[in-house]
């Protein structure tokens, strides 16, 4: 983690995070472009979670790669270690989270967005009655590249718009209080890695 904990400047936003080292992010790019990984983990058009998992590019225009939680690839493990460091700072900022039993236990995704792409519809991360969804406590996301024009993540209720910066990692509650969407970047591609912390027994 580079520097100190970041609290997104919006009243009680509960959106925070930090910045990961460039070499960690470069490792994720290497993983994405690794032909050996493409044979193991298929890249597929992005599905619209909570909408019957259909593909609709008017809602979500992306290519996604799902990564198993317990993969042993050094590039992914290095990222998970960095995410854990930022998560500890988030919990230090919101210490009531220590009273809840949660962990990183579900698979997660690297998502590539073409020019003009994005998850363009407001959505939250706990959006149906599936056990995977209802146990989500927090979402997390890291931007894998800088975007000069557009590409922001808009948190609607908080009226917070976060500009993509390589390594910037955000954590936020998974509930309806944090409906958000991705603003299209008209002239640039965008890449993120994203997933959830879930309740555990």
Regions found by a protein language model. Give the residues of each.
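Substrate-binding/catalytic groove segments of enzymes
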Residues: 38-39, 119-120, 147-154
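Short, conserved beta-strand element in jelly-roll/cupin
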Residues: 110-114, 129-149
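Catalytic core of Fe(II)/2-oxoglutarate
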Residues: 134-136, 149-201
């Amino acid at each position: 983690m580079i520097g100190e904990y970041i609290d997104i400047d919006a009243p009680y936003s509960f959106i925070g995070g930090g910045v990961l080292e460039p070499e960690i992010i470069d490792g994720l790019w290497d993983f994405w472009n690794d032909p050996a990984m493409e044979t193991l983990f298929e890249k597929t058009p992005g599905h619209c979670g909570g909408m019957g998992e259909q593909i609709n590019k008017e809602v979500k225009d992306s290519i996604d790669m799902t990564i198993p939680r317990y993969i042993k690839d050094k590039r992914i493990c290095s990222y998970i270690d960095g995410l854990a460091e930022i998560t500890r700072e988030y919990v230090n900022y919101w210490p009531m989270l220590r009273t809840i039993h949660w962990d990183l236990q579900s698979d997660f995704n690297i998502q590539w967005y073409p020019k003009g792409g994005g998850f363009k519809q407001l959505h939250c991360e706990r959006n149906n009655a599936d056990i995977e969804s209802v146990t989500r406590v927090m979402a997390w996301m890291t931007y894998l590249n800088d975007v000069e024009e557009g590409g922001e993540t808009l948190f609607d209720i908080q009226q917070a718009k976060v500009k993509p910066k390589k390594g910037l990692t955000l954590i936020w509650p998974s509930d309806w209080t944090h409906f958000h969407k991705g603003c299209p970047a008209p002239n640039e591609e965008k890449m993120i890695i994203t997933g959830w912390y879930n309740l555990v027994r």
